[in-house]
Amino acid sequence: MAKAKKPVKEEPFENQLWKAADKLRKNIDAAEYKHIVLGLIFLKYISDAFEELRSKLLAGEGEYEGADPEDKDEYKAENVFFVPEIARWSHLQNNAKLPTIGKTVDEAMDAIERDNPSLKNVLPKVYARGNLDPTNLGGLIDLIGNIAFGDAKSRSADILGHVFEYFLGEFALAEGKKGGQFYTPRSVVELLVEMLQPYKGRVFDPCCGSGGMFVQSEKFVEEHQGRVNDISIYGQESNQTTWRLAKMNLAIRGIDSSQVKWNNEGSFLNDAHKDLKADFVIANPPFNDSDWSGDLLRQDGRWKYGTPPTGNANYAWIQHFLYHLNPKGIAGFVLAKGSLTSKTSGEGNIRKELIEAGLVDCIVNLPAKLFLNTQIPACLWFMSRDKTNGGFRDRKGEILFIDARNEGHLINRRSKVLSEEDIQKIADTYHKWREVDGEYENIKGFCNSASLDRVRELDYVLTPGRYVGLPDEEDDFDFNERFTTLKDEFEEQLKEEERLNALILENLNKVKLV
């Protein structure tokens, strides 16, 4: 009797889409191609939203009776971008097979910016460049044209928003080290947001990259039956290209990005939100940044706990975040793990002052390989302006340490992600610890609530491993599982080596000897 065939697991829709789009990339660098693809996804989103509202205005029923479908104010009133005729998706699709399609798309982007001042200098105009084959661009337009089946704006925004976010992550992986400069891994953002729980208030990210922290904050509120309108976001980004991605990423989610600012001087030299006092700060600043213009800011009023060294911005960022917190505000951010132990150039003294001031709430040691742009070990800091209440129990004189180095799983030989279970485990530990009736327990090898006296004993070093100790049980080592993991990693390395050797050989064959 023939064995029944196992059902073939269908590949996720966004993964299929990514493979198809990547195939059309040909010889274009991933860093450039992402603007081409993401710009088109954005254009499809605003065109779908526009067409849906326009059909209601044309029907002229109920509240839309007597409305003019060509009146820009009608669209503005419902937070929908006005899309002129030459920029509508139907027009692009009708012209997708023409050799002039690149020029048509660039003109569409220009027209949208003219009619929507909030998008001025945001959209990419890169489609008529010589390295983008018109046939491939037409294929990409057809591909993206099939993303949102059905015309409901909410469905379209949800699907297109998800695809946009997925593609951001895939482009970051494709770019490797450079990709990490505009993208914080999704699982890290989810962990920060799940721990901070920004249900209501002002959320600030002064180094916002492509806006992932904001998108996740809004998602968090929606998933917990909160009201999205109770959150307002403020951000700043010094890289204009990345800022453009952030503006599109937020617009496709219908999130107001009017307070997400760009200037090339950055948050330290040109703080775009000088007077802002936020309820939440959530950020992933550049690790160990040595080029932050610290020599120009020696007497800055933000350095309340000590002047940070000019050669490393870690403790400048910490104090910048604290400066922007309101009296009951909470900050959660990523830093290089060295920030927990460093004593060079006065950093140890600043850390001591922060601890003695009762500002450090929780430290999380992260697994390796989570970040695309660096192999530097990372950690999360959580700081609270008021540990005595703020809706939680009095935690004055305590710091929670979580060692999450063993969490997460590999998705390829270079990259790891935290699963939903990992995120929940870490976040729940923090919540149980800080809540009034939380059933928190120290777990050897994972978490420990340490007294300020204990931190003093260890000379203000904040490495979680120093506090949590070794796990009670070391005998649950699974040899088969570990062997299989190592074998898979080794096979991936061999494949990558084979690919690189073939590429080198191909390039050598192109060299013509005179």
What kind of region is each of these model predictions?
Residues 178-283, 288-292, 297-304, 315, ...:
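Conserved S-adenosyl-L-methionine
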Residues 1-199, 261-272, 365-368, 386, ...:
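Non-catalytic, mostly N-terminal accessory regions of nucleic-acid modification and defense proteins
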Residues 287-309, 314, 352-356, 389-393, ...:
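Accessory, often C-terminal, charged low-complexity segments
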Residues 243, 269-272, 288-291, 341-344, ...:
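Switch/connector loops and helix/strand junctions flanking conserved nucleotide-binding motifs
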Residues 208, 237, 264, 285, ...:
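Active-site proximal loops enriched in glycine and acidic residues that flank catalytic Cys/His/Asp
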Residues 277-278, 300, 312-314, 328-332, ...:
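Active-site lining segments that contact anionic ligands and/or coordinate catalytic metals
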Residues 16, 23, 32-33, 37-45, ...:
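Conserved Class I SAM-dependent methyltransferase catalytic core
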